[in-house]
Every structure is written in structure tokens, then in C-alpha cells.
Amino acid sequence: MTEALSRAELREMARESGLDILGVTGPEPFSDAEHYIVDHIERGHTRGMDWFTVARTRESCDPHTLHDTVQSIVSVGIPFWTGLSEPPDDGILRGRIARYAWGRDYHKTLKRRMTALVATIEKIVGRPVEARTLSDTARIVDRAVAARAGTGWVGKNSMIIVPRHGSWVMLGEIMLDIHITPDLPLAQDCGRCRICLDRCPTGAIVEPYRIDAPRCISYLTIEERGPIPFQLRPLLGNRVFGCDTCQDVCPYTSAARPAHDPDFEPVTIENAFPSLERLATMTSADFYATYSGTAVIRAKRSGMARNAAIALGNSDDPHAEPILIQMLRCHDEPLARGHAAWALAHLTGDESHRPLTLALQSEPDPSVCVEIRQALDA
């Protein structure tokens, strides 16, 4: 088959579009990924995610269901490691947001850069191209594409590990009606290393390459819309959006170099290490003013307030007590008030009985009353 575009040309154009990482694979179904994901669902590791179905999995693993004239799939990546690791020592109780969400919403950044690359491809080939750009909002198995395209390999934490960048990489795909000679998968793996399994705060990596999603802090703090299970709350620490632990401890990822990409730098410290007091008390207007245009919006204000309450309860800092009492009395979200009750009891023990009892007398929401009673009985 005649090649309309070489990989070398494509890589150069990708770099000019801000896409530093690139690999190419064909449009064949991702059968191995399909078998693995269906087994994952049947084991119950996606419970709570009703949209994560076998039918959707089969569709996601067959590129022709997404683009019927696809001949090549381009896997692209943007490194996002900033080099910043710890919050400032400023005496403020701060939470921790996963690094990928520090800057602009990565979906929009990927979309913009992939669209620019498609426009350049059309100029080179001299015709309109039937293309579809995808990130993890669309139904395609990003990591299976990246692995087969030689972009990186799948680590035991299920993340794609890219040479020189580790897993600090945003992935996207471009489906093209152009034949490009595919890359070969990388002949590399994690060997005997299992540090990510041993260090996962909640034990969510139940075996190599398999995550029990409802135990994962990323799922709990972002996707879970209701209460977080009691036994997992102390394990969240000060994480209020996502978790980077299995990446932080990875030997490949810890050697990554800063990307210096302005789209992924935090606009302010609040986008990386937010003040827990501010997060616990901010209005809807404040929340959207601070996090609009970032991935944090996905967790919603109620979810972030809930997460802030847990982080305050885990802080072991007496300055958190009045913040939690204020949340318990005044927050307009029942989810936040309920978790503030747990956090207050977790933080202060028997000293929480009086404010909890007073709150119970005036609390109108049955779910919050249940949380308060459980906190009193703890």
C-alpha cells in the first residue's frame, strides 16, 4: 500500500503542533484489551460505574465503530510534569490536587493541538482528510492504542509509561483515512518491580495491571457522587482531587524531566494545593471562578467540599476544628455537612460530641443525621 505520509514527517509536524510524543498503529480491533476489560467488569472492578458496560467496551475496542474509513490511528502524548512537588510552607492547611488537573483542561489542550496537526496533514497530502480526534472523553481504549503504537508500555499501575517521561503524559488519538506504516510496540515492561502495588494508599491495585476502581482515590474523589466509604476516608490524607501516589513512586516516572508547558502549569497555588478552608467554604461563584477551564470542575463543588472536609479531618491540626464546625452548621450541601460530621469526630474525638449533638438538633437532612449519629457513636 502506498504511504501518503511518512512517520518522520508526521513526527516533525506533531512537534510543531505541541505534541511531543507520537506513535502509529493500524485500525485492527484491540481484541486483547477487549477480553481484559470484559473480564475486569465481570470481576466487579468497575462497580458503581453503570456506563462502563460490556457493550461499550466492545465498541471502544473496534476502531471502525468510531471511524468507518480509518486506515491509521496516531497516538499522541503531551508531557505535563512541572517539577513542583510540595505545597509552600505558609502555615495554611492545604489539600492536594492530582498534577494532571493543575493547568488547563487537558481535553481542550489535546483537542486544539490535534486539530492543528490534522490541518497541517491536509496541507501536506493536498486534500481534505477524514479525521477524528479523541481523548479519554470518547469511546476508545487510549492505553491499548498507545501500547500497540509504541508510544509507551502498560505499567503494573495500568498507566502508560513513556520513555524519559514516565506516566506524566496526556494521551490522545487521531484516526485518519490515510495509510501510515505502523510502529512496533516497545519491548519493555516493569520487570519484578511492584512498588506501585505496595504503596497504593487504599490497596486499589489488587494485582499487577488490575485496579479495583471503587477503592482508587481518583475514583472516590472525582467520580463518586455520594458519600465515601467510612473505612477509606482516613486513607485519603489531604488528597482532594485524584491521587498521584502510584506515579510518584514509580522509578520510571520519578526520573521524568519538567516539561515546562504553560498549559499544564498551575495558574495559582490554589490550582495545585488549595486552601482547605477556602475549598470548604467557597460559594458556587468562587468555585467556578477558580476552577472553570480545568479538570477539577468534573468533581463539582459539592464533591470538592466533601473531599475538603475529609482532608481537614485527616489533618491532625487543631486549626481545622472551627472550619469543620462551621461546615457542619452552615454549608448548603448535605454531602459536605455529613462528611464534616465524620471529620470533626475523627479529628477531635470526644470533644466533638457537643457540636455534633447541637447540629443534630437542627439538621433537616436525613442523610446528614445518619452521618452525625454514626460520628457520635464512633
Spans of features found by a protein language model:
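Short, charged low-complexity linear segments at domain edges
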Residues: I161-P185, A213-L232, S284-Y288
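Glycine-rich phosphate/pyrophosphate-binding loop
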Residues: T268-R306
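Flavin-dependent oxidoreductase catalytic cores
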Residues: P185-I195, I205-P208, I297
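Alpha-helix N-cap/helix-start positions at coil->helix boundaries
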Residues: R298, S302-G303, P318, D332-L335, ...
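Iron-sulfur cluster-binding cysteine motifs and their immediate structural context
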Residues: E16-L19, P29, I195-Y219, R225, ...
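Amphipathic alpha-helical scaffolding segments comprising HEAT/armadillo-like alpha-solenoid repeats
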Residues: D286-T290, D316-R329, G349-Q361
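Structural detector for internal amphipathic alpha-helices that build alpha-solenoid repeat scaffolds
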Residues: A305-D316, R337-G349, C369-A378
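Auxiliary alpha/beta "docking" domains used to position bulky ligands
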Residues: M1-D189, G237, P364-P366
